[in-house]
Design a protein with these regions (language model features):
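Bacterial N-terminal signal peptides that target proteins for export
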Residues: 1-9
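Short, aromatic- and cysteine-enriched interfacial helices/patches
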Residues: 2, 20-21
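Low-complexity, intrinsically disordered regions enriched in charged/polar residues
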Residues: 3, 14-15, 27
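Bacterial N-terminal signal peptides
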Residues: 8-19
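Noncatalytic, solvent-exposed loop/strand surfaces
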Residues: 21-418
Length: 418
């Protein structure tokens, strides 16, 4: 099985510059794409200028095949691209039940009985050639995953000194940027409801790594020291399945870690683990990542209902149904993709469909209401934006280039044969 990366000047690798919407990254981070959703967790670059047109023969800089499967986003630091993959060795563990002997599960999910190799890869950004690879572990995963997921779903993160790679129940691994192993941690097994698979990415701030594990047993949030990998604090959470990567923001003298989940949106103090505030109001299986707009955080969900809400960062305690929430809407929100926040405009799709909405991020007013995007039907990937354009890719390989506009403006439509 192969995962193929087709990198044009129009793709993710072009988005390697600064944004102004959330916490201030370091100078190096601002000039790179060092984590999931970029340096400001919004999916936006303010200075990149990717092309609007490409095809199999136009504006493709390089293309390489990657063994295995991994739905995590590659990250970029200077001249290197880092990504994760899990390769099925097809070597059978005779002590594990065969898939055909297992009970019927929802979505036909089977637990594997073969060993997987979990790899970290580094590619040359200019040529696509492999610079190094490191195998972190060989093991049989304890659970299966949904057909749209895999065993390498969390995106790596770097501070320019070290590379942090999270394979969920297969472990947390740290390397220097030349591939030298520095530390590793086994944080235990997660038991996802319906065996849907893991997917929350780590967040890095002030030499601290944040890991949220919301699943069907004891959910938790854990903060590790980035240099040593040792746990600084860990707090249990009452949550079911969720895959939303947290966002970190300093506000009013405190550094808040904001997590979105079905029972509560919560703000934790990064250094102590204290809950600063919490608020109910999202639906289940929360996957979209929070974004920061001014003095508010915007969270959303789109599974078995729709909810998007803007919560003041100055909140204290449990503010559920208190009237403190700045604004809320209950339609058109995404299930899997995260939103784009661009110059005060909040763009997102409905569920996993191609129905497109734009809100005023400050007021919550609807500027473009559930408008169908042409040429694509299903959307799982999160959109990215630059140069007053938004790039939305469907599962059929079609990418629409949209204008950053309160009305639908299609600039171009491009397809790769992947």
């Amino acid at each position: 099985m192969y995962k193929q990366i087709a990198i044009a000047l129009s793709t993710f690798l072009a988005f390697t510059s600064a944004s102004l919407f959330a916490q201030s990254p370091t100078k190096g981070q601002a000039q790179n794409w060092h984590q999931w959703r970029g340096p400001y967790s919004t999916g936006v670059s303010l200075t990149a200028n990717p092309p609007t047109e490409w095809s199999e023969s136009k504006n493709i800089k390089w293309k390489v095949k990657i063994d295995g499967a991994g739905s995590s986003t590659p990250i970029v630091w200077e001249d290197s691209v880092y990504l994760l993959t899990a390769i099925n060795t097809k070597v059978v563990d005779p002590e594990k039940p065969r898939p055909e002997d297992q009970p019927m599960r929802v979505f036909g999910i089977k637990h594997p009985n073969t060993f997987y190799d979990f790899f970290v890869l580094c590619l040359d950004r200019e040529t696509g050639k492999e610079k190094w690879r490191q195998k972190t572990i060989r093991k049989v995963p304890h659970e299966g995953h949904h057909g749209d997921n895999d065993f390498a779903s969390a995106s790596p993160v770097t501070d320019g000194k070290r590379l942090y790679c999270w394979f969920g129940s297969a472990g947390f691994y740290c390397f220097d940027l030349n591939g030298k192993a520095l530390w590793k941690r086994d944080l235990g097994l997660a038991h996802m409801g319906a065996s849907l698979g893991e997917g929350c990415s780590p967040t890095l701030h002030d030499d601290k790594l944040v890991i949220v594990r919301d699943h069907q047993r004891q959910s938790s949030i854990e903060v590790l020291d980035a240099e040593s990998g040792q746990t600084i604090w860990k707090s249990e959470r009452e949550e079911g399945n969720a895959w939303a990567t947290p966002v970190v923001i300093k506000h009013s003298g405190r550094t808040q870690v904001i997590t979105a989940a079905s029972n509560r949106i919560r703000s934790y103090d990064l250094y102590s683990g204290e809950i600063i505030w919490e608020c109910g109001g999202l639906t289940g299986n929360v996957t979209p990542c929070p974004v920061i707009q001014g003095d508010n955080v915007i969270c959303m969900s789109g599974y078995k209902g729709h909810s998007v809400m803007s919560v003041p960062l100055s909140s204290k305690g449990d503010i559920t149904d208190s009237g403190v929430v700045t604004w809320k809407q209950t339609r058109g929100t995404p299930y899997v993709p995260s939103p784009v926040l661009y110059d005060g405009l909040l763009f997102f799709n409905q569920s996993n469909s191609s129905i497109w909405t734009c809100l005023d991020a400050n007021s919550g007013d609807t500027l473009m209401d559930r408008t169908r995007l042409p040429g694509i039907a299903n959307i799982y990937s999160s959109p990215v934006a630059a140069a007053d354009r938004i790039y939305v890719t469907g599962r059929n390989g079609q990418t629409l280039v949209l204008g950053k506009s309160k009305e639908l403006k299609v600039i171009a439509s491009n397809k790769l044969d992947e």
